[in-house]
C-alpha cells in the first residue's frame, strides 16, 4: 500500500484536510534543498503524526477477509503489508509514489542529451514523494560516486570466488560482506535511540546503492572479461553511466538503455519475494546490507528473477526450430504446442496485472526507436500480435498480455550483453532503489517485527468446521 493509497483511504475516512497534509507537503516542498537526508528529516515527523492519528481513529477497522485459498495460495491478494514507495494497479501497472512509468519518463530529470529518466531521480521520488530538480539529481549522482569505493576485503573476496559460482551467489555474498561497514549495526550496538534508526538505515542504504555497480561490474569482469579492471568511478558521470563504463560498454545507447532498465525494474509493490524479504528481514532490525542480501537470495529464485532468461531460451528454441522468417500461422502452431505440452509461454501473464505491462511498453518503444530491424525484436513484436489471442482462445490465462520480462533480455542481447546468467544481477542492482527506499521509511515509521500467525491444516479445518478425516 503506497502512501498515496493510504492518503486516499485516510481522506475518505477522516474527511479532513489534515489527511492530505503529507501529500501536499511532498508535492510543494521547497526545491532549494539538495541534501536528501535533510528533506527526509523534514518529511518524517509529519508522516509519523499523520499515521499516528489515522491509527488512533481507525486502527480497529476491518479492511478485508482472508479465505482458506489465500492461506494455501501464497497469501495472494491478502492485504497484509504497508509499503509506501509504489503500488501496482491491475489495469494501469506500477505507480511510483503515484506516478506512472510514462509520467516518470516525462517528468524525471535526464542526462545531458539523453531521453530516459535517471535512476537517481526515481530514487529521490521513491524516498520523498517529490519529483526532483536537476540539481537534486546531480547531488545524488555525486553522493553515490563519493561513496562507491569497495573495502579491500570485499574486492579480495570477489576476486577469489570460483568461476562456477553463480553471479547472483557472488552478488549476495559480497553484499553480506559489506555488513562490516554498517553504520546501522554499529549504532544499534552502541544503544542509539530508536527514533534515530532511520538516519543510519539511510546512510547504509546510500552507501550500498553507491557500491552495487562496482560489485556487479567486478563480478561481470571476473566471469566474462578475464578479470580485467573495472576502472575508476567518474564523479562527473551519473550512476548508470559509471556502471556501463565499469562493465566495459561505451555505446551511448546502451547507457540510455541501462538508465531505463534500472528505473523500471526498481520497485513493484511490497508483496513480491525480494521486496517482502527485505521488509521481513529488516523488521528484525537486521541492517540494510543483511536485509538486501536476503532479498537478493529470493530474487535468485527461478520464479522471481530468472524469467527474462527463460524468455530468451524459449525464443532461441523457436528460432532454431522454425528458422529466421516465421509466418504467423507457424508461430501460432508453435505457441499451441508449447501450451499443449503443459508449459507456459514465458514473458506472458502476471500475478496482478490485467493489461500489457507498461514496463514492457516502454522497452518496446525503446526498441522501435533504436533497433527496429533487429531480428529478435521483430520476433518479440510478432509474438505480441499473436500470443494474447492464443492465450484468450485457450481460456486459462487471467492476463494474456506481456510482462517486463518478455522484452528486457532481447534488448540486452542486442547491445552485446549475451551472458544470460548475469541478467538477474542487473535486476538486483535496480531493485535496491525501491526496497532500500522503503527500508528507510520502515525504520522511520517504527514498523515492528513481522510475526504473522501460522496454522496447521488441522487447525484450519477446525476453524472452519470441516471434518479432518
UniProtKB/Swiss-Prot annotation:
Reactions listed under catalytic activity: oxaloacetate + acetyl-CoA + H2O = citrate + CoA + H(+)
Known pathway: Carbohydrate metabolism; tricarboxylic acid cycle; isocitrate from oxaloacetate: step 1/2
Active site annotation, chain numbering: 304, 350, 405
FT transit peptide: 1-30
GO molecular function ontology, one term from the record: identical protein binding
Alphabetical list of InterPro entries matching this protein: Citrate_synth-like_lrg_a-sub (IPR016142), Citrate_synth-like_sm_a-sub (IPR016143), Citrate_synthase (IPR002020), Citrate_synthase_AS (IPR019810), Citrate_synthase_euk (IPR010109), Citrate_synthase_sf (IPR036969)
Taxonomy, superkingdom: Eukaryota
GO biological process, any: tricarboxylic acid cycle
GO cellular component labels: mitochondrial matrix
Cross-referenced Pfam families: Citrate_synt
Assigned keywords, A-Z: Mitochondrion, Transferase, Transit peptide, Tricarboxylic acid cycle
EC number: 2.3.3.1
Subcellular location: Mitochondrion matrix
Binding site for oxaloacetate: 359, 431, 451
Task performed by this protein: Key enzyme of the Krebs tricarboxylic acid cycle which catalyzes the synthesis of citrate from acetyl coenzyme A and oxaloacetate.
Misc. remarks from the entry: Citrate synthase is found in nearly all cells capable of oxidative metabolism.
Subunit-level organization: Homodimer.
Family: Belongs to the citrate synthase family.
Annotated protein name in UniProt: Citrate synthase, mitochondrial
Native species: Tetraodon nigroviridis
Lineage: Eukaryota, Metazoa, Chordata, Craniata, Vertebrata
Gene expressing this chain: cs
Amino acid at each position: 500500500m503506497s502512501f498515496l493509497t493510504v492518503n486516499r483511504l485516510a481522506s475518505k475516512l477522516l474527511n479532513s484536510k489534515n489527511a492530505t497534509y503529507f501529500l501536499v507537503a511532498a508535492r510543494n516542498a521547497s526545491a532549494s534543498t539538495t541534501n536528501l537526508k535533510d528533506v527526509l528529516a523534514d518529511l518524517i515527523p509529519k508522516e509519523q503524526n499523520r499515521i499516528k492519528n489515522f491509527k488512533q481513529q481507525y486502527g480497529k477497522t476491518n479492511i478485508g477477509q482472508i479465505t482458506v485459498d489465500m492461506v494455501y495460495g501464497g497469501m495472494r491478494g491478502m492485504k497484509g503489508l504497508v509499503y509506501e514507495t509504489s503500488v501496482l494497479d491491475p489495469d494501469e501497472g506500477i505507480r511510483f509514489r503515484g506516478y506512472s512509468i510514462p509520467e516518470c519518463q516525462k517528468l524525471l530529470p535526464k542526462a545531458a542529451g539523453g531521453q530516459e529518466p535517471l535512476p537517481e531521480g526515481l530514487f529521490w521520488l521513491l524516498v520523498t514523494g517529490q519529483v526532483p530538480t536537476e540539481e537534486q539529481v546531480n547531488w545524488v549522482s555525486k553522493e553515490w560516486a563519493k561513496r562507491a569505493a569497495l573495502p579491500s576485503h570485499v574486492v579480495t573476496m570477489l576476486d577469489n570466488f570460483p568461476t562456477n559460482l553463480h553471479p547472483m551467489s557472488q552478488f549476495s555474498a559480497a553484499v553480506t560482506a559489506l555488513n562490516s561497514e554498517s553504520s546501522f549495526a554499529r549504532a544499534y550496538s552502541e544503544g542509539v535511540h530508536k527514533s534515530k534508526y532511520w538516519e543510519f538505515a539511510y546512510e547504509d542504504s546510500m552507501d550500498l546503492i553507491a557500491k552495487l555497480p562496482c560489485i556487479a561490474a567486478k563480478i561481470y569482469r571476473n566471469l566474462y572479461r578475464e578479470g580485467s579492471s573495472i576502472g575508476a568511478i567518474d564523479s562527473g558521470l551519473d550512476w548508470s553511466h559509471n556502471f556501463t563504463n565499469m562493465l566495459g560498454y561505451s555505446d551511448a545507447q546502451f547507457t540510455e538503455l541501462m538508465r531505463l532498465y534500472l528505473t523500471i525494474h526498481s520497485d513493484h509493490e511490497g508483496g513480491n519475494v525480494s521486496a517482502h524479504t527485505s521488509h521481513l528481514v529488516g523488521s528484525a532490525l537486521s541492517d540494510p546490507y543483511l536485509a538486501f542480501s536476503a532479498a537478493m537470495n529470493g530474487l535468485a529464485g527461478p520464479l522471481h528473477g530468472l524469467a527474462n532468461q527463460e524468455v530468451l531460451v524459449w525464443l532461441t528454441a523457436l528460432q532454431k526450430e522454425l528458422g529466421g522468417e516465421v509466418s504467423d500461422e507457424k508461430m501460432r502452431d508453435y505457441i499451441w504446442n508449447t501450451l499443449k505440452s503443459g508449459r507456459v509461454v514465458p514473458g506472458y501473464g502476471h500475478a496482478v496485472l490485467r493489461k500489457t505491462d507498461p514496463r514492457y511498453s516502454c522497452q518496446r518503444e525503446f526498441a522501435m526507436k533504436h533497433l527496429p530491424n533487429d531480428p529478435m525484436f521483430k520476433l518479440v513484436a510478432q509474438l505480441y500480435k499473436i500470443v494474447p489471442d492464443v492465450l484468450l482462445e485457450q481460456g486459462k490465462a487471467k492476463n494474456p498480455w506481456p510482462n517486463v520480462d518478455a522484452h528486457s533480455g532481447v534488448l540486452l542481447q542486442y547491445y552485446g550483453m549475451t551472458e544470460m546468467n548475469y541478467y538477474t544481477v542487473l535486476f538486483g542492482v535496480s531493485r535496491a532503489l525501491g526496497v532500500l527506499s522503503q527500508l528507510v521509511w520502515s525504520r522511520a515509521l517504527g514498523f515492528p517485527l513481522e510475526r504473522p500467525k501460522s496454522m496447521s491444516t488441522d487447525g484450519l479445518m477446525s476453524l472452519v468446521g470441516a471434518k479432518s478425516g
